[in-house]
Amino acid sequence: SNQGIIVIGDVDVDHTEAMIKKLFGGIKNPANQAPVLDEPVPDTAEPIVIIDKDKEQRTNNVQVMFKHDTYPDSLKNSVEYILYGYLKGAALNMLNDRYTEAAQKADCPYVGAGASDDNYIFAKTKDAFSIFAQPKDPSQLAASLTAAVVEARRAVEFGFTPTEYDRYKADLLSSLDKAYSNKDKRKNTQFFNECLGYFLTNEPMPSIDYTYQLMKQMVPAIPIEAVNEYMKQLIPKNDSNIVIVNFNNENEGAVYPTRQELLAALQTAKQQQVTAYVDNVKNEPLITKKPTPGTIKSEKKNDKLGYTELKLSNGATVVLKHTDLKKDEVLLSAEGFGGSSLYGEKDYLNAKMFDEVIANSGLGQFSLT
């Protein structure tokens, strides 16, 4: 009992069904099988604090979880549940964008932080809004916890800005358009995960056509006030149902946070005065002055492999190939011979970190976020 078989792929349905019945049809449940119970996770009046260390734990990090009730499985097959998922996705996406932006600041105590809202650890009967932070230095762990919770409180107290919400909706609708235009090229793993969610927790699995039409109507109609109201529900005003988990790299001579320090960091975050977030939107072109265009020196077609090779006046070689694998997708990559091997030994570390630094540095006058 309580087992399922999911088959996804280009298979002979009748033959596959017959084989499943042949292989599994004779399995019987034991006479006195143990009942399957979903153990309830109790509410807690006082915070739970867990501190641990291990030599194989490479980084020090801290996480605070605010437990709350799950969405009932019996009510998931509804438009209301899809709306709930949209509000949650919008709030978490915009909050995580703020964490990414904050981490770029020199005085930010964490190198990275994020928020999620899902199962409380592995429990099916309790969910949790979780905030995670990894400090720049182990000595800043408590400060990282404070800063990460303060950022969430900023969203709770002042909400998100219209410009943030406009960007989120534009990105979501763009993703929907792309998924819909490539609906006949979905991967088997996508279908499998939808079936698995439906079997385990009654997650709805509407068709891509239904989802597309519903979201195209829903997204423009939901005001930012609805998202902000959802955000307000995530952090409780008291200390009930709070869990703090801190994992540390075990190292000789290291000093680890105490229960009192972590609780004090959380209380500081809950009591600290916060100001509204300012979305510094830049309405200017990425390139203010267009470069002088070059010329195409030569063009050569390869009919056998279906590509065209161009030689440009700046010495670059461009290879163009048209495919119909995915609609509305253009993939571009560039490389130059030599790379870091052209630099001396003293620039080894600089060359090694170059790609990561550039990826986190934004473009032109625009920051990463």
List where the protein language model places each region.
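Glycine-rich, charged/polar anion/phosphate-binding loops
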Residues: A45-I51, G114-D118, V227-N228
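M16 family metallopeptidases and their MPP-like homologs
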Residues: S1-I8, R58-V79, Y99-I224, S240-N248, ...
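Surface-exposed polar/charged interaction patches
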Residues: N182, K237, T268-Q272
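His/Glu-rich zincin catalytic helix
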Residues: S1-D107, L145-T146, F247-T369
